[in-house]
């Protein structure tokens, strides 16, 4: 509140939440949607996306023929992959922080990250290459700015889609 211009409209309320996801979003004849399937964080609108993606996936994979064990396994694998990519994007914001004014921010900067995110960070550090996977919610234009590094080779990174136009000017 120290940086707030003017008086606060009300006292801030602490809202506690637990992050995570179900191991099986589709289990037997039940498919969890929304907050019953998992929760990542309150600042991005990822929950809305995950609901829409879950419903779309279920419509595409609905077991009209009766059997559903293989479909449920595939549904769960795709859902888990989607949760993990979104998780990586959120963790990246904390991991790459330049803040070190509190133990919280130092712990974020020093934390161990999932292998999938560690690879993404290493590739970007080494080459300035940022990418969007086929099923990633966040595009290159979202990943690249978060992955910025002061005086880094990544400054020469050209966002996908702009390369053709740039090549035409050379």
What are these regions (language model features)?
Residues 1-97:
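FAD/FMN-dependent oxidoreductases across multiple families
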Residues 60-170:
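Long, low-complexity C-terminal extensions of enzymes
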């Amino acid at each position: 509140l120290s940086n707030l211009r003017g008086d606060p409209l009300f006292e801030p309320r602490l809202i506690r939440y637990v992050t995570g996801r179900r191991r099986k979003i589709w289990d037997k004849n039940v498919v969890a949607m929304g907050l019953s399937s998992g929760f990542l964080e309150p600042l991005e609108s990822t929950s809305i996306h995950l609901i829409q993606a879950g419903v779309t996936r279920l419509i595409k994979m609905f077991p009209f023929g009766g059997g559903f064990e293989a479909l449920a396994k595939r549904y769960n694998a795709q859902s888990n992959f989607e949760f993990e990519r979104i998780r990586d994007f959120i963790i990246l914001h904390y991991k790459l922080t330049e803040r070190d004014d509190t133990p919280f921010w130092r712990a974020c900067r020093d934390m161990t990250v999932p292998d999938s995110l560690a690879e993404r960070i290493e590739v970007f550090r080494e080459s300035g290459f940022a990418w969007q996977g086929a099923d990633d919610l966040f595009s290159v234009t979202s990943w690249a700015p978060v992955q910025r590094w002061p005086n880094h080779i990544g400054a020469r990174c050209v966002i996908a889609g702009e390369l053709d136009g740039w090549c035409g000017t050379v």
